[in-house]
Amino acid sequence: MPALSSRLRRKHPSLTPRPGAGPRQRSAPARTAGTAVEAGTARVVGTAAEVGTPSIAGTPGVAGTATEAGTVDRSSLLRPRQAVRWRRRLVPGPADREVLWLYLLTRAGIWATAYCTRWLFPDDRKTPHVADLFAPWQQWDWGHFLHIARDGYFPGQAGPWMNGWDNREAFFPGFPLVLRAVHTVVPHWATAGLLISFVSGAVAVLALARVARLYLPDGNAGRRAVLFLLLSPCAIFLAAGYTEALFLALALPAWLAAHRQNWPCLLYTALACLACTVRVSGLFLVAALAVHFALTVRTRRQWRALPWLALPALAPLVYSWYLHLHTGDWMAWKHAQERGWYRDFHAPWEAWQNTWHAAFEESLPTGYALMSQAELLAMVVGILLAGVLARQRRWPEAVYVGLSLWALGTSYWYTSIPRATLLWWPLWILLAGWSLRTPRFTTMYLCLTAPLMTVFAVTFLSGRWAG
């Protein structure tokens, strides 16, 4: 029997008692930093028991409570750890502060550009009077957002059945609703819009840096991705009262939460739902999250979270229902885009051909022709990006970029694709990875894109079409 007993111990180590684990030790209740057990354990006061034993997990006063049966309350053990984890996520660390410093520097540069543009490019070149401080920012789509926030979508029974209608229902209600809310505190409309983009941009760059650190191990990856975004050609639209900054401030944290949390999680579905109220691109985000869900779930219990992915689609559905009540058209926002911006469906090759004609056949004024050339270049960049993502088997990101390209590349001609590059966060992470492997890449990128960013900024701030 002794030989048999030793063999059993070797095969089943759990059957072998630990040294010193006698009956007294096994029956003793766990020492905790919570309340005392009624079964004769030492009374706990403050951070440790009076008998001089440390609390569980080595942190005084945070390690849970002991139950009457001598077991530890696991929920109370996890709560402090979760609090620390959330504190680390919400409180900016040193790397986050570097990102925010970079963000503030670029904002100062853009505002300096706006100041100079206001003096150098007035509407009347011979006027001695300078325009209002906020005049350069009140261009193009800003007027639609202002009218929606101030007057609503259908003021005074006006609508698409009237001549000269501005097709404002083409714009989703997320940004105008936030603008109206901020306006209750900040009376000046333009200031309220700029403040929204300023705060949203800060949230977006912090989230982008953290997403980049999920993909790239280098500590400089996040700051490098943010640098490439903030100095990209169309970065002016992150500072203006437009939807790009607000959308990224919702979409990037949703993407980050989807990668960090276990399924199910209401956080990223709620953020994605809010993103869908800002831009139709939110639906592309939902599709990417669905692909990510399908590739990462492992258990039947996790699959039960699948219906939650339908929650973000409620936002466009509710907006379509609202438009239907006023117009009788469930797709009124899409038809408004077709009337105002030629976004009726065309085959991709037809859209390319029409844009090429506008860019090089001298059929449009030179400013519009140059922006058409930028549209073609942005489409090429998007196709290459989608191809690289597919080759790397990053299917969720490839779906997100691919759907964006399909939506933008099937109109009569290309419109606002350079602006859409701001929303392609896989592009900035990919460029950051290349720059970390090839140090000269950063210098090359900055030398090429910084002048283009200035050109786009001056174009927009002076009231010309900038995509």
Give the location of each predicted region.
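Transmembrane-helix signature of polytopic, membrane-embedded enzymes
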Residues: 191-192, 209-231, 395-399
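Loop-to-helix entry region of an early transmembrane alpha helix in multi-pass inner-membrane enzymes
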Residues: 163-164, 169, 173, 177, ...
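Short acidic/glycine- and proline-prone juxtamembrane loop motifs at membrane-interface regions
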Residues: 240-246, 417
